[in-house]
């Protein structure tokens, strides 16, 4: 009886199996390369810290300038409350820019670590997957920067009030030139923002990274579908539950009581999840087609 020949891809992959120690060595190598890429990107970004801070402060400055033109606020400004705060904020800004700048290297190193466990036909997806991952991550950050942050700071600055008046009873009822009168003093004060560099950068960077990570959802579910862990039908049946989960996650993950950010994240998650179903359909179709082609080759070799 003739035994069916092993698929060439499986033979090659069996030869490439690594012991656990080699997996650890490979992980250290990929982490080292990612960290080196991030350090170089951070140093380059720090050289442009001034323009970068002006860029990241633009959503706040635009909202503040509009309120200032309407007479509700003084000209925009930011303060720092400790000697090292400005330096630390600019360094963290350079690090954040370095993450986006080095994201092609980081995603490529991640793929290089995962790829030894994949067949050759799946490895051919490396470059498209890296490109799409980078575009989704950067696209999520841009979505937050263009649509979420301006509305967020317009909403927060709306709590300011240039002339909030109160009446304080200072002396009470007194006799003045033979007459009983109520002596009161009306005081007026303003509620104005005094935003520190650290607080602004903390909220802004959190939203940028959060939306960047959320936009990776189609890639994550697409890879799970390619590995056979999830199916398009299962994802579609879970859709109505995911919509609820998406808006709850938006309320939990978005900092503060930022309603605009919560709705934007919930809506973005819902759209991305449905896009992921389409990606899973394509991945499943490609996998079935490749399996059918491999089976045909195996049958041909067995004859």
Where are these regions (language model features)?
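Membrane topogenic/interface segments and analogous intrinsically disordered interaction regions
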Residues: 1-303
């Amino acid at each position: 009886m003739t035994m069916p020949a092993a698929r060439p891809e499986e033979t090659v992959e069996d030869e490439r199996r690594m012991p656990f120690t080699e997996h650890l060595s490979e992980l250290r190598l990929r982490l080292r390369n990612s960290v080196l890429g991030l350090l170089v990107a951070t140093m380059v970004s720090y050289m442009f810290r001034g323009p970068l801070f002006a860029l990241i402060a633009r959503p706040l400055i635009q909202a503040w300038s509009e309120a200032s033109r309407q007479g509700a606020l003084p000209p925009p400004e930011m303060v720092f409350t400790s000697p090292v705060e400005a330096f630390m904020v600019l360094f963290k800004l350079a690090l954040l820019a370095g993450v986006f700048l080095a994201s092609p290297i980081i995603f490529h190193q991640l793929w290089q670590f995962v790829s030894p466990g994949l067949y050759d036909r799946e490895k051919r997806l490396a470059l498209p997957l890296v490109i799409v991952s980078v575009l989704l991550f950067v696209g999520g950050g841009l979505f937050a920067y263009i649509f979420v942050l301006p509305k967020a700071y317009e909403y927060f600055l709306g709590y300011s009030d240039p002339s909030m008046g109160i009446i304080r009873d200072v002396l009470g009822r007194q006799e003045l030139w033979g007459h009983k009168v109520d002596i009161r003093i009306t005081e007026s004060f303003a509620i104005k923002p005094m935003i520190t560099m650290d607080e602004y950068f903390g909220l802004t960077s959190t939203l940028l990274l959060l939306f960047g990570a959320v936009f990776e959802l189609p890639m994550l579910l697409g890879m799970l579908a390619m590995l056979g862990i999830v199916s398009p039908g299962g994802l579609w049946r879970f859709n109505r539950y995911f919509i609820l989960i998406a808006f709850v996650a938006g309320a939990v993950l978005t900092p503060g009581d930022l309603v605009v950010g919560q709705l934007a994240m919930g809506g973005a998650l819902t759209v991305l999840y449905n896009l992921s179903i389409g990606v899973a359909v394509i991945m499943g179709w490609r996998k079935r087609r490749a399996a059918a082609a491999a089976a045909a080759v195996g049958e041909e070799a067995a004859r």
